[in-house]
Swiss-Prot record:
Protein name (record): Phosphate acetyltransferase
A GO biological-process term: acetyl-CoA biosynthetic process
Role played: Involved in acetate metabolism.
Organismal lineage: Bacteria, Pseudomonadati, Pseudomonadota, Gammaproteobacteria, Pseudomonadales
Binding partners and assembly: Homohexamer.
Organism, scientific name: Pseudomonas putida (strain ATCC 47054 / DSM 6125 / CFBP 8728 / NCIMB 11950 / KT2440)
GO MF entries: phosphate acetyltransferase activity
Region (Phosphate acetyltransferase), start-end ranges: 374-695
Family: In the N-terminal section; belongs to the CobB/CobQ family. In the C-terminal section; belongs to the phosphate acetyltransferase and butyryltransferase family.
Compartment annotation: Cytoplasm
Amino acid sequence: MQTFFIAPTDFGVGLTSISLGLVRTLERAGLKVGFFKPIAQPHPGDTGPERSTELVARTHGIKPPVPLSLAHVERMLGDGQLDELLEEIIRLYQQACVGNDVVVVEGMVPTRHASYAARVNLHLAKSLDAEVILVSAPENEVLSELSGRVELQAQLFGGPRDPKVLGVILNKVRTDESMADFATRLREHSPLLRGNDFRLLGCIPYQPELNAPRTRDVAELLGAQVLNAGDYEQRRMSKIIICARTVANTVPLLTSGTLVVTPGDRDDIILAVSLAAINGVPLAGLLLTSDSKPDVRILGLCRGALQAGLPILSVSTGSYDTANQLNSLNREIPVDDRERAEFITDFVASHLDAAWLHQRCGTPRELRLSPAVFRYQLIQRAQQANKRIVLPEGAEPLLVQAAAICQARGIARCVLLAKPEDVDAVARAQGITLPPGLEILDPELIRGRYVEPMVELRKSKNLNAPMAEQQLEDPVVIGTMMLALDEVDGLVSGLVHSTANTIRPALQLIKTAPGSSLVSSVFFMLFPEQVLVYGDCVMNPHPSAAELAEIAQQSAASAQAFGIAPRVAMISYSSDSASDEEVEKVREATRLAQDAAQELLIDGPLQYDAAANPAIARELAPASPVAGRATVFVFPDLNTGNTTHKAVQRSADGVSLGPMLQGLRKPVNDLPRGAQVDDIVHTIALTAIQASVAR
């Protein structure tokens, strides 16, 4: 069992963020990772579960042991019961080890009230026989002083040459140079880091966005009255302005993520903020001070801003005192802020020395495809594919943001179908930086070039030029023609268009792949422990046995293409012993699929619980090669598939990616209803990988 003990050199180094990122890095190596925070250190105002433990549980789907309370630990230390305390901690540590390859243990943070933290950390590291990784955050100090501070902490655990003291991770690095250049300069000034005994295991740059709380968090921490909640669950405060100036001087400051603080009687500022919100600027919110609220007639004029999601809060304190409170807000990650926790986790993981850490841990007992690994590999493979993906709904704000992310990270070469001025306006309003190389094509200017090719493709259906021109008024049809002519590699739509509007042009112009007679779909279900494939939950209402067999083969091929070993369960309400028309259909579909793909591991009919649960499988289907370990679930009809997908997703705390369409000659994918930026990014990545597999 490998154990990494994460020890801070000082207060405020961001220890929890490093723990989140380290667990993610180790998971990406296919390792089964446990986490353990032996001693809870609640922040002022914390009333729920211990923060680090709960955040790791929610972001990684693991269940760490509950930490000991700080009061209990201090009582035992005060009574001279250090040995008994360590025994208690080791018992909890053993729980964290069960079934895992490696355990990350988060040490105590030294505070004004816990000056003994360093001594306790030393005893913990030795008692757990752990390898120590120090975490430090550079202050405004010369590099030699930073090196000296780190070396002093390393001495507490046996010194930098002790084989159990691995190295240091530097967090919140504030510099204009790249992290690679900073690391090189640090090594030049630090003899400690020049050899292989004590390594620099990561440099994480300071990123203000990582500290941006939700507007809801701001309201709760201030005890503010919520006059209009709007989008306060989603919007984040990245900057604050105190309005004691004219409207003309305030307007340039009304940008994405800004919290505007002003007395409630400043009608001019309130109206200016409302106009900015109506024009699409996603402000963090409007905070009214001095316990004064605007006249109801003014609020009536703000109705459009309220409908646009502008949060409005009110506090009794004056603007100066409110500003002081805002500057002293607790910026720790709330345990229910999954979006921010995931962002920090991936950001930290991307700056750690993953190759060395993976090598240090060796080969896992059994490679596993966790959700974190699946998402990571999805992005990596899409980057390698380097495909050109067209987005017909090009001026939609969520799509513009997703396209900018994909372009900047090299996930895909995105093509937005929209007027460039519309995209620019969206980007300005939303605070989106459009990266170089992001293509924006005006449908009005390119529509004419596709009339003749479309007539040729549809001549068997007697399509003429005027009919083609009319259909090409739809940007989805233009995008589909671009795909048909190999100008792009894939298409993603459906944010505002219906599934039918996305799929119909593809069926007419792209058609099904060779060997396919139908188009079906799969969802990738990301559960805490594994990733499963569900098909078909979108396309085929009542498939025949032959169609169900084809869906099974398509779904197995999709699983294989995305790194999931396909073990296909053909789902039915009853086990193999029952006999009626529906069960017989599933049985026949299983036989047809086995005959068509003899290498495929497939079984059915199987009840869902027998396919998914090893204990039930041993009772209901002991001889099945799939029961209890299925990775691909094929449902007998659309009603069953769609209902199961939604119910299981909600009850099992799962996240679904998809639907991903399969069976088309070229990849076209429909976005799920209510898709957010992450959903769109992942759908673009899925499409890029499909395109690379198809080639």
